[in-house]
Amino acid sequence: MSELYDILVETPPTKVILLALDQGLWDCERSLNELAALCEANHMEAVASVTQKRQTPETGIVLGSGKLEEAAAAAGELGAECAVFDGELTGSQIRNISTALGGMEVIDRTMLILEIFRSRAVTNEGKLQTELALLRYRLPRLQGMGESLSRQGGGGGGGGGARRGAGETKLELDRRHVHARIDALAEKLAEMEQRRGESRKARAKTGMPVVSLVGYTNVGKSSLMNALCGPSVAEADMLFATLDPTSRKLVLPSGMAVLLVDTVGFVSRLPHNLVEAFKSTLEEAAWSDVIVRVADAGDDQREEQLAVTDEVLDGLDCADIPRLTVYNKCDKPNALNFDPDILLTSAKTGYGLDALLKKLDELLSDRVHTIRVLLPYDKLGLAAPMRERGSVQVEEYREDGLYLEGIVKTEDLHCFEGYLV
């Protein structure tokens, strides 16, 4: 098994060439840099890029024929096996561009991200969400593959009309199959969401405040969680290392226990199908008491990344939830000084973690109270809220009862009425 693992690890990445149409709608260079990082996350190496500035796409092939000839030549010279387009393509555009590139495989940005999600999903829900997104992506593109379906589905006798009819029948069968699978997946995910809602209610009963780490993918959210709570969450210096939400208990300096949630990372122009498919996962942030927006201190695109994060959060009705901004990875050489309202942290060195914990305590201060109580020995069960949802700082067994000093949540204060000292 280890030998097979070593072989798989040493497999060289697939060489790809990047294609882009620059219509002036966004920073094309930055977008291509992000696309190259996405390729790396999918075990691909971008060896060249071809960009064309034009306001309107070329009919059928998006880029001009001259640019595609340039791309084909570069791919042949550099050994690229696949072309990745920085945008979304229709089925017919994929086929036409592939033909212009001599039959080379062509995928678009959305398909690349979907493939990354497919390979990274761990839980059953994550896998189902990814499959649903893939099917919704492929459904409108089945028509674009009509000609190849016709060639594959045509019979031996008869003319072209018979072959086209067979192809159309296969296309309709494909559509029905995809629609049926989409409906089945949606039903399963709805059941899972109902169970997730029940879990949230159970979690709410514990009274433990929820703090969600949100932000662009690969900014170190999982590393930050591990630095705060101790190693447990998988870390990787790559895009979309975390797809399924992970929850850990964290005790703040005040003694208050909170639930820290690591969420799926965002990316600019995240495909709509993915936003919809992973909405239940992203909605973990909407149930938070505090949202920690995490960015990479050394990334000059951090402000744009936070804007993407806020855009997604605003769509999840998180506007009224307090937000805290953290620039992680401040140990990197190109990290700079920032606004004093922004916390600088390094999950690697531990810098700034104490300040982050203190700030969380401040934001959640109205949720807890420090109290002293004396519980009769026949009422020791009343100590449970302090033990389970707060913290016990002093515990003494006295002649007349159990003396406790500690922190309790505001909603648990009524449990100790009549026993405060």
Question: What are these language model-derived features?
Answer:
Residues 2-4, 196, 202-209, 227-259, ...:
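Switch I (effector-binding) loop of TRAFAC-class P-loop GTPase G-domains
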Residues 2-8, 29-33, 56-73, 242-245, ...:
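Switch II of P-loop NTPase G domains
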Residues 22-26, 54, 58-61, 88-91, ...:
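Conserved Switch II/interswitch segment of TRAFAC-class P-loop GTPases
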Residues 110-114, 239-240, 347-349:
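Short, acidic/turn-prone active-site loops that include or flank metal/cofactor-
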Residues 1-114:
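N-terminal accessory targeting/assembly segments
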Residues 111-130:
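Short alpha-helix plus adjacent loop in nuclease-associated cores
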Residues 10-11, 75-77, 242, 250-254, ...:
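Conserved catalytic network of the ASCE P-loop NTPase/AAA+ motor domain
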Residues 1-17, 140-219, 225-226, 230, ...:
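C-terminal-of-GTPase-core extension/linker across diverse P-loop GTPases
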